[in-house]
């Protein structure tokens, strides 16, 4: 805990208030922090963003007992918390009479944006979309959970393979669109970014020129001539907002391949 003290101090300098439950409060106070009660903050704030892997548990034990006019947001792992929300994909869902939302994960945003750009925005009919998520082992800020060799994720969903395709299917199903999707995933020994392989099979033939034009017009997908994730990561670190790339995905232009009605590429 003490080695993250500087991170908390930086947030407080930017205007954040530190709140904690009774178990953690004494630890923070022993390091010199002013700490307010977590329970009090539940009452004072109108929007509660839960970034923990306990969103569903916290809803059942805490949030469901609070004022129903508050808004509750949970992270992508908490499937079933509420309807999916992906920025730029289904913003209209925020107008619904709903007080809790599930913020789609980075991979869900990535796949959804690819489908929006190359299928939905072009009024194409999709026969099938197949995706392989090449996932990083852990974040650059983490020491544990590193995988020293490629580790395969089980296909535990008969219809969709892994949860990645299922989540995107459910996201678009909320809009009345049912897409034929399948995903696989493998964890690689890297701390850089996730990489996504995709193959879209359309009802009719397409051309690379048309695909590149769709990519150029996309608001949330960017493109790059770089072919290594470390180069893309380095660019984001040097030039992105707080070192971040906030696009849904960065398409490697030279990876795009069109053969008749099939588009293949990496993001």
Which ranges hold each PLM region?
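C-terminal substrate-binding/catalytic lobe of Rossmann-fold NAD(P)-dependent oxidoreductases
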Residues: 1-36, 125-267
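N-terminal Rossmann-like NAD(P) cofactor-binding subdomain of oxidoreductases
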Residues: 1-141
């Amino acid at each position: 805990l003490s080695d993250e003290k500087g991170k908390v101090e930086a947030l407080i300098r930017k205007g954040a208030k530190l709140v904690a439950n009774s178990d953690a409060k004494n630890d923070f106070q022993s390091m010199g922090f002013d700490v307010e009660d977590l329970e009090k903050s539940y009452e004072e704030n109108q929007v509660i963003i839960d970034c923990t892997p306990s969103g569903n548990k916290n809803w059942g034990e805490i949030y469901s007992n609070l004022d129903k006019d508050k808004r509750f947001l949970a992270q992508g792992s908490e499937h079933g918390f509420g309807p999916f929300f992906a920025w730029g994909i289904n913003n209209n869902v925020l107008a619904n009479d709903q007080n809790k939302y599930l913020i789609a994960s980075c991979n869900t945003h990535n796949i959804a944006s690819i489908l929006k750009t190359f299928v939905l925005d072009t009024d194409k009919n999709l026969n099938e979309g197949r995706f392989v998520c090449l996932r990083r082992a852990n974040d650059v800020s983490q020491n544990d959970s590193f995988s020293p060799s490629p580790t395969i994720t089980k296909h535990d969903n008969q219809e969709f393979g892994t949860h990645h395709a299922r989540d995107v299917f459910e996201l678009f199903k909320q809009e009345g669109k049912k897409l034929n999707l399948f995903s696989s995933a493998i964890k690689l020994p890297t701390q850089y970014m996730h990489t996504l392989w995709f193959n879209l099979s359309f009802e009719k033939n397409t051309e690379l020129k048309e695909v590149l034009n769709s990519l150029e017009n996309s608001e949330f997908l960017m493109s790059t001539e770089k072919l290594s994730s470390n180069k893309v990561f380095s660019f984001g670190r040097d030039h992105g907002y707080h070192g971040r790339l906030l696009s849904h995905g960065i398409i490697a232009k030279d990876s795009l391949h069109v053969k008749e009605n099939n588009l293949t590429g990496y993001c």
